[in-house]
Amino acid sequence: MNLIEIREGKASLLIPNPKDYEKEGRYDPSWSPVFYNPKMRLNRDISVLALSVIKPKSVVDALSASGVRGIRYYTEIGGIEKLILNDKNPIATELIKKNAEKNYVNARITTKDANSLLYEIKADFVDIDPFGSPAPFILSAINATINKGYVAFTATDLSALECSSKFSARRKYDLICERLSFSKELGIRGLIAKVIREGAIIEKAAYPIFSFYFDYYYRVFFRIENGAKKVDKLLEKQGYYYECSKCGYREVDYYAERKICPRCGIEMRRYGPAWTGELWNREFLLSMKENLKNFTYFDTFMQVNKLLNILVEESKYVSPYFRLDFIASLIKRNIPKREKMLECLKEASITHFDYRGIKTNKEIDEIVNCIKIN
């Protein structure tokens, strides 16, 4: 295997030469014998930033591939006393050993099935960053997380979570769903709901503290706390979102029944079960923003800063975003400028989920009125 050296964050890494695995001038990281995706750099930068707030003593990267994520945590955060880097691919674990030595990282490196490993150990922070769906690893990852510890999941199977693929959504995430105008946000709410339900099985409450959508994936961090009563309170915030495709009316209910729009008389589209609470712990979010000044070396520093600024404003509003082009088309009006809408609504912000959307806790009628006068 021909290796090349790259640098990411403060880590120097050996990875398989992508040129050796090109097909007709194209390259996909999954074609390499050891997976390394440069497009996930922002994901890893933000994760390093999040861990600078969490300050874990023990970390598990259960699907390590090249080892980049765990190695960066160790070298850039400090204070990690126990690091486990795991991959079931023996070629990957051999490369992880080289990369760990190269960066003076003291880690336990294992070649195990991720679920098997996670049922054997406990850690302050568990990271699940799969190629595809995290669903097969959710329960074991929560089980491996100590009380008042943290776990993070990446999901790249947006076709399931956003309900482009209904059968996949049902199989992986127990979703009964159709595509709504704000499906980009519903996807992350569906993922959160699934994690909460999996934690409920073993009476562990999974509180979402930081979430974001970027490019083609979701990333969510949870704080885990033991206790059946805590779990019950979280489960009370699982519900179904409904939207009328004719007038844009929407509502939330806690039962998966079919509903007729009270205004138009047509059957509304639905999505659920989904998390109906906050996507961000504001204190955690502000701590991340404060710590960012220590990571000016990030290649994605400007992107991360911009994203955090949006999230700080967005976190003021619990309700899912409204898509302006969707509502404007229903009332046969031109799409207004977002700035005009924010000025009209007064209590609103842009959203990172969709450049066509705005976040507000106001109702559809107020959105419609603002579109009409702008």
UniProtKB/Swiss-Prot annotation:
Residues 4-371 form the Trm1 methyltransferase domain. It catalyses: guanosine(26) in tRNA + 2 S-adenosyl-L-methionine = N(2)-dimethylguanosine(26) in tRNA + 2 S-adenosyl-L-homocysteine + 2 H(+). Gene3D superfamilies: N2,N2-dimethylguanosine tRNA methyltransferase, C-terminal domain, Vaccinia Virus protein VP39. Keywords: Metal-binding, Methyltransferase, RNA-binding, S-adenosyl-L-methionine, Transferase, tRNA processing, tRNA-binding, Zinc. S-adenosyl-L-methionine binds at residues 44, 69, 87, 113-114. The keyword Metal-binding applies. Dimethylates a single guanine residue at position 26 of a number of tRNAs using S-adenosyl-L-methionine as donor of the methyl groups. Belongs to the class I-like SAM-binding methyltransferase superfamily. Trm1 family. This is tRNA (guanine(26)-N(2))-dimethyltransferase. It comes from Sulfurisphaera tokodaii (strain DSM 16993 / JCM 10545 / NBRC 100140 / 7) (Sulfolobus tokodaii). The gene is trm1.
